[in-house]
């Protein structure tokens, strides 16, 4: 799977409203966003922001399939979807270079943005009115006669238009013509360098300086009056708003407080976009819960995303292979051979029947024995904890069950990558693929990101044998994880030359990711065994601003996952002091387990050299047939008779 396929898989930006609706899976995030309030939708690239925005629009509501299991929500406002237009940023860049007045550049950018918003608004109004006379649809209204003509005249005056006739279509065409003319004027002005002042600019662009909120809200209020819905609300659905110039972002974010009550604002943003550099007034500025709600499209704990992943998968299967859609997904994809155990044991992990328990202990015993034979530090750990790998049932029954379950995935990884007879030496480069198969692993690696999940599903279905039966062969699953993760890595590699707006990236994002992954892998495999090797990092004060800027870019693209919410409206002002982990989609690429663990400072991880396991500690580890080993009682480790037959 190449980068372009990876990025285009299920990209709602290029899909019609009907196409988006046919595969849409509502989630709790959608419910949070859909309410009758202002909202900031924050998420990395590919996390589904455009899908959610489109499915709140009038077009999305009307495209909602009648046979969908989840009924259409009762949304009382009319959503106006405003797609991103990179031209806003390009216009400002073209004008502000060569010493063009930056204030005038902002004015030009806002005019471009307002024109796009008005165009989206009038197209939505056309939809509400156009079919009302024939077959009434969701939120259809009637606008006829003198009331119709009066509103056209009023809107044209508000927007500075001269439509060729008194019709909604004429207003639309006038705005389309304005947008074309406006871009031509901007190109002309840019070629003149800094020769234009404000008066000359207004002479060429008489509609310059239209107020965003007032231009939109006043026209919508008058439309409500014209159709007899004086209390009706509208919502601007501003997609990918981080690409808009900073002045526009400031205008919209300020409007979250004190804006027109008839006009809701729902804004999609990257977590570390330019808007996070804006100063916030704690007294007069908007505040979360009071003025808006913040919806975060990422899942630090994998369990939070499982239900959504299941819904997305079943919807996709219903189209691709309907016979599979009703089956348990663990039957379709199988289970992960080595359980993925988080810091806290779930109820599912605690309850198992006796045959399942015996099978688990048998497989775990083989792993423990194999690693202990080639890893003295692990043998020492077992002795300290009183765990006999030849009789795990005894330890599992009494006091070590949680420990055994917790370390089993670590032991499996360590055993897979360590060579026999050489302290701290790793063996071949082939990944331990058993950890990346089964529905649990697939859902975890997707991170609740629909584009990633569907990308893996497409790859799995492409690579499997048609008559292979169930569960789907592991080879098809591991190949899909490798291909999808590899395409993601290539996308991260390209970020070295594609920094975020206004940012100077001191070090390529992928370099930092690779350093972190190597550190975590070495701690897991080559250092002395510990039951909780670090897999989480904290951005500490020793980290340079250049590295932090690279991390911000990584967060915007989903390469790292933050455990804490944003520290300001719409994103993160600073990453320092916050905990992160690498995205699980990168796990197979860098030979890491799909789990969280204890944390380490980022500076420690980045400044670490090649880690080698030290020799055994001074504590004596007797060979088989020796007498009991005494352990320091203050550690809580249980003394045990060392009779393990190594």
PLM feature spans:
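The conserved Walker
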Residues: 45
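A short beta-strand-to-loop transition that corresponds to the Sensor-1 phosphate-sensing loop
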Residues: 56, 268-273, 450
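P-loop NTPase nucleotide-binding core
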Residues: 54-222, 285-393, 451
């Amino acid at each position: 799977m190449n980068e372009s396929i990876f990025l285009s898989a299920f990209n709602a930006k290029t899909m019609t409203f009907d196409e988006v609706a046919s595969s849409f899976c509502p989630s709790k995030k959608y419910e949070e966003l859909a309410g009758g309030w202002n909202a900031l939708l924050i998420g990395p690239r590919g996390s589904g922001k455009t899908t959610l925005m489109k499915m709140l629009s009038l077009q999305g509501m009307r495209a909602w399939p009648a046979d969908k299991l989840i009924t259409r929500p009762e949304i009382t406002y009319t959503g106006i979807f405003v797609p991103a237009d990179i031209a806003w940023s390009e216009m400002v860049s073209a004008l502000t270079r060569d010493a063009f007045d930056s204030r005038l550049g902002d004015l030009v950018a806002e005019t471009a943005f307002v024109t796009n918003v008005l165009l989206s608004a009038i197209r939505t109004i056309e939809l509400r009115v156009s079919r009302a006379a024939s077959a009434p649809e969701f939120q259809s209204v009637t606008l006829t006669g003198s009331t119709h003509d009066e509103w056209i005249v009023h809107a044209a005056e508000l927007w500075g238009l001269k439509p060729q006739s008194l019709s909604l279509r004429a207003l639309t065409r006038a705005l389309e013509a304005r947008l074309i003319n406006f871009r031509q004027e901007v190109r002309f002005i840019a070629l003149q360098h800094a020769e234009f002042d404000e008066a000359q600019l207004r002479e060429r662009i008489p509609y310059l300086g239209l107020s965003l909120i007032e231009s939109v809200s006043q026209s919508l209020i008058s439309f409500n009056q014209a159709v007899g819905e004086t209390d009706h609300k509208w919502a601007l659905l501003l997609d990918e708003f981080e690409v808009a110039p900073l002045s526009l972002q400031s205008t919209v974010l300020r409007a979250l407080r004190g804006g027109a009550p008839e006009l809701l604002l729902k804004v999609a943003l990257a977590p570390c976009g330019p808007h996070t550099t804006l100063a916030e007034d704690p007294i007069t500025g908007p505040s979360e819960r009071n003025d808006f709600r913040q919806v975060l499209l990422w899942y630090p704990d994998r369990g939070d995303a499982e239900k959504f992943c299941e819904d997305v998968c079943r919807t996709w299967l219903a189209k691709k292979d309907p016979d599979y859609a009703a089956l348990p997904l663990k039957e379709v994809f199988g289970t992960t051979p080595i359980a993925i155990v988080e810091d806290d044991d779930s109820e599912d992990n605690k309850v198992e029947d006796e045959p399942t328990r015996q099978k688990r202990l048998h497989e775990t015993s083989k792993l423990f024995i194999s690693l202990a034979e080639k890893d003295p530090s692990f043998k020492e750990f077992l002795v300290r904890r009183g765990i006999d790998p030849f009789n795990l049932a005894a330890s599992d029954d009494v006091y070590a069950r949680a420990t055994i379950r917790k370390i089993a995935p670590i032991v499996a990884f360590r055993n897979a990558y360590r060579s026999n007879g050489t302290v701290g030496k790793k063996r071949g480069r082939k990944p331990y693929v058993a950890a990346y198969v089964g529905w649990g692993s697939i859902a975890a690696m997707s991170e609740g990101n629909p584009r990633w999940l569907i990308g893996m599903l497409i790859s799995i279905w492409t690579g499997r044998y048609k008559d292979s039966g169930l569960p789907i062969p592991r080879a098809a699953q591991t190949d899909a994880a490798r291909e999808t993760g590899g395409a993601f890595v290539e996308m991260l590699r390209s970020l070295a030359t594609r920094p975020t707006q206004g940012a100077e990236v001191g070090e390529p994002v992928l370099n930092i990711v690779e350093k972190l992954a190597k550190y975590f892998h070495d701690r897991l495999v080559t250092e002395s065994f510990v039951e909780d090797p670090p897999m989480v990092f904290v951005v500490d004060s020793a980290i340079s601003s250049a590295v932090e800027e690279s991390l911000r870019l990584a967060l915007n693209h989903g390469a790292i996952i933050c455990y804490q919410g944003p520290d300001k409206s719409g994103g993160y002002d600073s990453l320092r002091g916050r905990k992160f982990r690498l995205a699980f989609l990168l796990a197979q690429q860098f030979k890491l387990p799909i789990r969280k663990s204890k944390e380490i400072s980022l500076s420690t991880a980045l400044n670490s050299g090649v880690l080698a396991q030290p020799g055994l500690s001074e504590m004596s580890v007797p060979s088989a047939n020796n007498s009991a080993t005494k352990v320091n009682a203050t550690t809580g480790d249980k003394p045990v008779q060392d009779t393990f037959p190594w």
